Amino acid sequence: EEDTKPLPAPNLQLMPSTHKVPRLGRIACGTPILADQNIESYDAIPDYVKCDFTLICKGDSMINARIFDGDIVCIRQQPEVESGEIAAVLIDEEEATLKRIRLFEDHISLEPENPMYRPLVFWGEDMNRVHIIGKATHFISTIR
């Protein structure tokens, strides 16, 4: 006789536990990055994602890194990154941009992940125009 007992239900956790992380809008010049006037809202981020703030990706310059327009990008605040990492940077203390960073002795290249766009290259003294605000650690994408 065949055993027809139901199998036990697997222990599934459908939604990971989360914590609230500030979403930054435009970053004001000269203010601490997490100052109240820079915070647009808060995102619920899974606890396993370690980040200090989020940004919303605007545009299609990072699509080959699978980061699309409207995605939430999780950023760990740090002033330096390794060459080849994706980071949020401020150029001329203006709006933040997300690019792959290539560091050289005499220049910095901010590289998009889309062949339709050209890298932004800063040589010599112009390298001081670029301020790394943090490393992209994760992104949260919506189903399209």
Label the predicted regions.
Residues 108-113:
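Short, solvent-exposed secondary-structure boundary/capping segments
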Residues 75-82:
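Short acidic low-complexity segments
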Residues 74-75, 88:
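Hydrophobic beta-strand signal
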Residues 83-98, 102-107:
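Short, compositionally biased
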Residues 114-123:
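Flexible, small-/acidic-enriched active-site or ligand-binding loops
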Residues 1-68, 96, 103-107, 129-130, ...:
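Short, positionally conserved secondary-structure boundary motifs
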Residues 70-72, 85:
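Structural motif
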